[in-house]
């Protein structure tokens, strides 16, 4: 596992992207990678994918506030954007998600071996080829959470997973998004949104619709 502590400050050391698992390069565009035949430069003043500081206003297209862009689910050969339309189809569900969902169900039923096998099928598939996990109990669930976060990144699951697991008020309170600001080869760890996230526990439950309360005087709204 890569130690990122050096990049939680300011350094001229190049991030060890080549030491990360294959899904990193398949998920994001970063400085030094290629996209549509261009070498990407996500630094201040970069010619392809320049950095732009966070602000609570509109942004210019083709710039980043984190030092990274999204690559996942995009086909370099198909991208053709016209206004709000694109030739890129949205992938609603993948087989990897099916396997992970089933693995979690097996875990809840105390079927440890089945849960391990299903998650390891995701990790060991062609193009990823990562060793399997043999943990069990709470340790397995922690591994599973991390696996799901990586495998399903940017597919719209993490927020709802955290709600489903009742962990959002722990993971998201006082949380900020961070990134790397690159200036003349210097990497600076920065806040990307300028504010702490908040998740009060009342958000785990949706309010009772006003129409239902009007229909039945015995129904009361949640206190929170």
Tell what function each PLM region has.
Residues 85, 90, 123, 131-224:
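Long, intrinsically disordered, low-complexity segments
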Residues 30-36, 128, 150, 168:
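Short loop/turn segments at secondary-structure transitions that flank enzyme active sites
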Residues 7, 11-95:
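Flexible, polar/acidic helix-loop-strand segments at domain edges
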Residues 20, 24-29, 90-122, 141-151:
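Extended, hydrophobic/aromatic-rich amphipathic alpha-helical segments that build helical scaffolds
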Residues 2-5:
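Surface-exposed intrinsically disordered loops and tails
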Residues 16, 20, 66, 118, ...:
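Alpha-helical structural motif
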Residues 68-74, 117, 124-127, 149:
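Charged alpha-helical initiation segments
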């Amino acid at each position: 596992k890569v130690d990122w502590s050096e990049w939680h400050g300011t350094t001229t050391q190049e991030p060890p992207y080549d030491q990360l698992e294959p899904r990193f390069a398949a998920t994001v565009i970063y400085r030094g990678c290629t996209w549509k035949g261009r070498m990407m430069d996500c630094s201040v003043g970069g010619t392809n994918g320049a950095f732009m500081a966070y602000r609570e206003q509109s942004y210019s297209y083709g710039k980043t506030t984190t030092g990274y862009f999204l690559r996942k689910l995009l086909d370099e050969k198909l991208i053709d954007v016209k206004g709000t339309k694109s030739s890129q189809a949205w992938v609603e569900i993948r087989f990897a998600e099916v396997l992970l969902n089933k693995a979690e169900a097996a875990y809840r039923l105390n079927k440890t071996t089945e849960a391990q096998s299903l998650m390891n099928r995701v990790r060991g598939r062609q193009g990823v080829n990562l060793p399997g996990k043999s943990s069990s109990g709470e340790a397995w669930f922690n591994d599973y959470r991390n696996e799901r976060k990586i495998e399903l990144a940017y597919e719209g699951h993490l927020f709802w997973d955290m709600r489903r697991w009742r962990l959002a008020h722990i993971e998201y309170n006082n949380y900020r998004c961070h990134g790397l600001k690159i200036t003349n080869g210097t990497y600076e760890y920065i806040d990307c949104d300028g504010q702490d996230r908040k998740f009060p526990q009342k958000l785990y439950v949706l309010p009772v619709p006003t129409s239902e309360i009007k229909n039945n005087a015995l129904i009361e709204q949640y206190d929170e």
